[in-house]
Every structure is written in structure tokens, then in C-alpha cells.
């Protein structure tokens, strides 16, 4: 895994710095686990096949988001996302706006754009009592957006916790679609 990360980082740097094409063609199937390019996760709705393909490195000028944007949130990687897809107590949430999601997403994730999350806390297991949310029985939320420079998930996390969602029930896949 360390070698894969180092190789991917090197490809991104060389592509960004020198404008050269990466040595792995876009669309090439990538290994998820050692000698495994496909993982099948059993969910309540049936099996979901997980694959990864090479994408062009992100070249946006965004600001790198903190690994822990709100105290108490858990940073995670691809393995935890895959495990969460099979966990009935968890939800994998794509917090990007709909225009980004239609270009591709993590199979089995639900769409909950960051601008809508506060109005949709009920879908995450919270109940509304008057004007306040009670999130004591909330699901574990495994959330992602476009990648390390994307502010959409961190914005949603701040709004969620401000409304009473427990930070320790939020798992942040900061690598997002850039790493996926």
C-alpha cells in the first residue's frame, strides 16, 4: 500500500509539475487490496461491486482541508469506506453537489449535498424535537467529497455538529473522489 501511495503521489507531482501524462493510462483498473481489483460488499440491498480506475490528477487551486475539520471526527481511508458499505449501522454519504455526483461516485453511497445536510438529518437517524435535533440514535456517517482541497464535507460537518450531530459519529474520507 505504501508503494501504491508513493507511486500515485509521484504520478500526480510529475503530471502537475511537468505537464506530462501519467504512465498509467486513465481508465486502467487499479488494485484495491493485494492481487484484488474487485471487491464485492454484501449490503441489505444486495451485493455491490467495488472497482477503482486511474483518473487524471486533480489540478485545482483549492485550499487543503484539515484531516480533522471538527474535533472528534475520525479520518479514514478506502478500507474503512468499503467496510462501512456492509455495515447496517453506517451510511456512506456523498456530500458533493449533484453536478459532481453524476460524473461518478462510490457505489452504494447516498447523495446528500453539503447544502442540504442540515435539513436532512432525519435520514441520518436524528429526530426533530421542536426546533432542535436529537441525534443520540444517529447512524455512523462515512462522508466524502472531491478530495483534500474540497471544502464541501467540512462545511457540512460544521453545520451537522452545530445542529447537535455527534462529531464522534462522523468518519471523514478526506481523499474523496480524487483518491477513490
Short names for language-model regions:
Residues 126-180:
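Catalytic cysteine-centered active loop of the rhodanese-like fold, especially the PTP/DSP P-loop
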Residues 1-4:
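Positively charged n-region of N-terminal signal peptides that target proteins for export
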Residues 63, 104-109, 163-165:
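Short helix-loop-beta junction
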Residues 74-139:
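Mid-length scaffold segments of soluble, non-membrane domains
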Residues 6-15:
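Bacterial N-terminal signal peptides
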Amino acid at each position: 500500500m505504501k508503494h501504491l501511495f508513493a507511486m500515485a503521489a509521484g504520478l500526480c507531482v510529475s503530471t502537475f509539475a511537468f505537464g506530462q501524462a501519467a504512465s498509467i493510462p486513465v481508465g486502467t483498473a487499479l488494485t484495491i487490496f493485494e492481487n484484488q481489483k474487485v471487491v464485492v460488499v454484501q449490503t441489505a440491498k444486495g451485493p455491490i461491486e467495488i472497482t477503482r480506475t486511474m483518473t487524471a490528477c486533480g489540478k485545482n487551486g483549492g485550499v487543503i482541508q484539515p484531516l480533522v475539520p471538527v474535533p472528534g471526527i475520525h479520518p479514514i481511508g478506502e478500507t474503512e469506506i468499503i467496510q462501512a458499505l456492509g455495515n447496517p449501522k453506517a451510511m456512506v454519504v456523498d456530500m458533493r453537489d449533484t453536478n459532481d455526483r453524476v460524473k461518478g461516485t462510490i457505489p452504494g453511497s447516498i447523495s446528500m449535498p453539503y447544502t442540504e445536510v442540515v435539513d436532512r438529518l432525519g435520514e441520518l437517524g436524528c429526530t426533530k424535537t421542536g426546533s432542535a435535533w436529537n441525534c443520540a440514535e444517529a447512524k455512523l456517517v462515512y462522508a466524502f467529497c472531491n478530495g483534500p482541497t474540497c471544502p464541501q464535507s467540512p462545511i457540512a460537518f460544521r453545520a451537522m455538529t452545530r445542529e447537535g450531530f455527534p462529531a464522534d459519529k462522523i468518519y471523514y474520507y478526506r481523499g474523496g473522489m480524487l483518491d477513490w
